[in-house]
């Protein structure tokens, strides 16, 4: 995989840049930059300053206006900042012009996410997927790269007659992309065989926004340790475990979390992870109820799921982290409209129970609150699916050791 863009030796300091547009109001942009700061922290970067600008659309040359770019430059120079991160994907022209003006390292949201994925990838499969995504991202941006890729390959004897350095680099990357795609086809074939060999057990997939507690819930349900951390994208590789509830076995998979503005390169590269979602019989959508914008996160996940798989699948909504939920009651004489922070947990429960009927539950995976109720719900849903598929199968009546 490509070397990390962000140094691991010491914590880098960075400034964040976001645009307020007709599509993104000021409140939304602040939320997006909160998430960008969390992404930066996950990558080992401390976000020390944020810059906002109100524009109808991004400047095609420098993303922000010339005056704002000058303001950023003055801050960067005065405070010896070495990194500026933009919340949206930058074009080749924008990257080149911003780097030329600021004379520091520039990342956009996509590049930052790719860097985190490169750090998180553990298996050969995940590493191959990330490397493919990196090269796809790099290809249209070759003109502004500071170093040439042919150094990684020796260079001598590799250039065709009359080729420029840029053409050589493009060919090297295209060759790498082709090889990585071939590698992934072979890996995906193996994964597909593994999935087919799982037998008649019902498949349940945990899905949700990143950092909502899917891995913690996986640990609680499967009684085996899956890596869980308060960082974005703690899980990259799909983990599959056999879970037994009241003598009923099923397969439970923990998948990579979704996020706003997820790069197309990553969505396409992580095909095998998405296959777990496509081939699942039941989806368990885990939500962080304590997050101030959890409803928008639900929309992001549902939108991504509809892009992955057009078929309707049964789903259970699991509202996690009720132990961390807080709200601010309104004073009686406060006539301003209520916001999300003024709504208590009981009201949210009533709203979502009414919307989802019996397919909704509120838990704390960390504190094990309401886990027995979730297991009972899973038991009923998995049993329904199994009986529908195998009405005369004695599979449900075999004896299993829950330990």
Walk through the language-model features, giving the residues of each:
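Conserved Switch II/interswitch segment of TRAFAC-class P-loop GTPases
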Residues: 21-23, 59, 89, 278-299, ...
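N-terminal accessory targeting/assembly segments
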Residues: 1-113
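Short alpha-helix plus adjacent loop in nuclease-associated cores
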Residues: 111-130
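Conserved catalytic network of the ASCE P-loop NTPase/AAA+ motor domain
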Residues: 8-9, 76-78, 242-246, 251, ...
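C-terminal-of-GTPase-core extension/linker across diverse P-loop GTPases
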Residues: 1-16, 37, 136, 140-212, ...
């Amino acid at each position: 995989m490509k070397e990390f863009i962000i140094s691991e030796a010491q914590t880098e300091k960075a400034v964040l840049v976001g645009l307020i547009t007709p599509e993104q109001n000021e409140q939304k942009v602040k939320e997006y930059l909160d998430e960008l700061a969390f992404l930066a922290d996950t990558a080992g970067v401390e976000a020390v300053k944020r810059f906002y600008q109100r524009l109808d659309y991004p400047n095609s040359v420098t993303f922000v206006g010339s005056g704002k770019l000058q303001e950023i430059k003055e801050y960067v120079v005065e405070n010896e900042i070495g990194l500026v991160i933009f919340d949206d994907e930058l074009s080749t022209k924008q990257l080149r012009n911003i780097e030329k003006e600021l004379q520091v390292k520039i990342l956009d949201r996509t590049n930052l996410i790719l860097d985190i994925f490169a750090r998180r990838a553990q298996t050969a499969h995940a590493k191959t997927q990330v490397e493919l995504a990196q090269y796809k991202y790099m290809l249209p941006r070759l003109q502004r790269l500071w170093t040439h890729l042919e150094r990684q390959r020796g260079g001598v004897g590799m250039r065709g007659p009359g080729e420029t350095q840029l053409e050589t680099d493009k060919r090297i990357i295209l060759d790498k992309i082709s090889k990585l795609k071939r590698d992934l086809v072979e890996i995906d074939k193996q994964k597909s065989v593994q999935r087919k060999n799982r037998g008649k057990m019902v498949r349940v997939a945990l899905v949700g926004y990143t950092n909502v507690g899917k891995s913690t819930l996986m640990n609680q349900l499967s009684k085996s340790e899956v890596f869980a951390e308060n960082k974005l994208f703690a899980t990259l590789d799909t983990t599959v475990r056999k879970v037994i509830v009241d003598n009923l076995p099923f397969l439970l998979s923990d998948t990579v979390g979704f996020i706003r503005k997820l790069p197309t390169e990553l969505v396409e590269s992580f095909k095998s992870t998405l296959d777990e979602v496509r081939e699942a019989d039941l989806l368990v959508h885990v939500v962080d109820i304590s997050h101030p914008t959890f409803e928008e996160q639900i929309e992001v996940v549902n939108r991504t799921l509809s892009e992955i798989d057009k078929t309707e699948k049964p789903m259970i909504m699991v509202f996690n982290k009720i132990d961390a939920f807080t709200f601010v009651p309104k004073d009686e004489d406060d006539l301003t409209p209520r916001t999300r922070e003024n709504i208590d947990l009981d009201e949210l429960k009533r709203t979502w129970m009414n919307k989802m009927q019996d397919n909704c539950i509120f838990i704390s995976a960390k504190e094990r609150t309401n886990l027995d109720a979730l297991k009972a719900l899973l038991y009923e849903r998995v049993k329904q699916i199994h009986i529908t598929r195998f009405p005369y199968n004695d599979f449900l009546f075999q004896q299993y050791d829950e330990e």
